[in-house]
């Protein structure tokens, strides 16, 4: 498979090193705040798009956490899923924002963590989203996943739920590929890892890929709002089942009392309405993560069993870490 330069192994290694050096580490003794939280809380995430300032989309959440915990929140932008997973396993990350696939893989690899809540697009909504199979609107020969056979197909990242795992399951169900192995996928098409959901969509729009995958909001809203895509420029030829939402998780090393407090905090106060009331931000600037989420709602580990099932269907090596 082809992988863009910024997703090479050296970059992944550098990412892990960054997490190791920049973070205080949950496994290291440190004093606590008056509220009972570590003096420094490390929050790690990766961009769903090629963002140079991911932190800005977390600012309202960071302000809320710092006010309620009395802690200094240290934000770390990782370059790929592997860095965040390794940081959590190593105890160098206290809180992390995971795609569903990365959350499951982190657990498989031994990360001890508890889900704090999953993001929702709008107030009152359910935590979940879909993967889209995409082609250019003027491409008459691609109208479903079967038509991806023999084509240049953009995936996002080997650790992406909606950019790799669910698409692979769909391709297997349509008989396009035999399994989720690199060899079987490469035998059926020319796969390219674009590195981001926006990069995947742009590569399709620009003709660098004949077809590909990205998650729904990135194509339906984010890129159109930014002017990167025109309405109707791409067509959706496939939609996955609903995928459990991207999730904030806490390192179990924080302890059950702290984690319970964080669960309540995320459920009650990690949302646009609360951020605005506190004066942390206004309007769309209050939407958090680069998924532009309205807020966070409670979830359990069992909510991610659907992802585990798709791992079983695909037999993907990536599900094993």
Swiss-Prot record:
GO cellular component terms listed in the entry, alphabetical order:
ATP-binding cassette (ABC) transporter complex
Which range is the signal sequence, renumbered to this chain?
1-22
Task: Name the major location.
Answer: membrane
Show the Gene3D superfamilies listed in the entry.
Periplasmic binding protein-like II
At which residues is a lipid of type S-diacylglycerol cysteine covalently attached?
23
What's the protein's topology in the membrane?
Lipid-anchor
Which domain of life does the UniProt lineage start with? Answer: Bacteria
UniProt keyword annotations, A-Z: Cell membrane, Lipoprotein, Membrane, Palmitate, Phosphate transport, Signal, Transport
Keyword NADP belongs to the record: no
Q: Lipid attachment points, N-palmitoyl cysteine kind?
A: 23
Protein induction:
By phosphate-limited conditions, via derepression by PhnF, and probably also via the two-component regulatory system senX3/regX3.
Provide the GO biological process annotations. Answer: phosphate ion transport; transmembrane transport
Q: Give compartment(s).
A: Cell membrane
Q: Which family does it belong to?
A: Belongs to the phosphate/phosphite/phosphonate binding protein family.
Question: How does the record describe its quaternary structure?
Answer: The complex is composed of two ATP-binding proteins (PhnC), two transmembrane proteins (PhnE) and a solute-binding protein (PhnD).
What PANTHER family does the annotation carry? PHOSPHONATES-BINDING PERIPLASMIC PROTEIN
- What's the protein called, per UniProt? Phosphate-import protein PhnD
State the organism named in the record.
Mycolicibacterium smegmatis (strain ATCC 700084 / mc(2)155)
What gene name is given for the protein in this entry? phnD
């Amino acid at each position: 498979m082809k992988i863009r330069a910024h997703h090479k192994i050296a970059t992944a290694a550098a990412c892990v090193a960054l997490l190791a050096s920049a973070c205080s580490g949950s496994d290291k003794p440190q004093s606590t705040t008056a509220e009972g939280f570590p003096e420094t809380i490390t929050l790690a995430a990766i961009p769903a798009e090629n963002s140079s300032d991911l932190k800005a989309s977390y600012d309202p959440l960071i302000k809320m956490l710092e006010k309620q915990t009395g802690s200094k929140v240290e934000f770390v932008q990782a370059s790929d899923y592997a860095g965040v997973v390794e940081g959590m396993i190593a105890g160098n990350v206290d809180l992390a924002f995971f795609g569903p696939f990365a959350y499951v893989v982190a657990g498989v690899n031994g990360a001890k963590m508890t889900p704090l809540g999953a993001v929702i697009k709008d107030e009152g909504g359910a935590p979940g989203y879909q993967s889209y199979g995409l082609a250019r609107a003027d491409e008459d020969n691609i109208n479903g996943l079967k038509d991806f056979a023999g084509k240049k197909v953009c995936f996002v990242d080997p650790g992406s739920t909606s950019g790799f795992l669910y698409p692979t399951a769909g391709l297997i169900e349509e008989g396009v590929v035999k399994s989720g192995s690199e060899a079987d996928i490469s035998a059926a098409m020319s796969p390219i890892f674009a590195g981001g959901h926006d990069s995947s969509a742009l590569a399709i729009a620009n003709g660098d890929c004949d077809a590909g995958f990205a998650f729904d909001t990135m194509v339906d809203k984010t890129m159109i709002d930014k002017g990167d895509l025109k309405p109707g420029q791409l067509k959706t030829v496939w939609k996955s089942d609903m995928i459990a939402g991207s999730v904030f998780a806490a390192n179990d090393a924080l302890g059950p009392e702290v984690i319970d407090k964080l669960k309540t905090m995320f459920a009650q106060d990690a949302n646009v309405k609360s951020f605005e009331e506190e004066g942390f931000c206004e309007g769309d600037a209050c939407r958090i993560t680069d998924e532009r989420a309205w807020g966070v709602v409670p979830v359990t580990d069992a909510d991610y069993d659907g992802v585990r099932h798709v791992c079983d269907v695909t037999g993907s090596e990536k599900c094993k870490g």
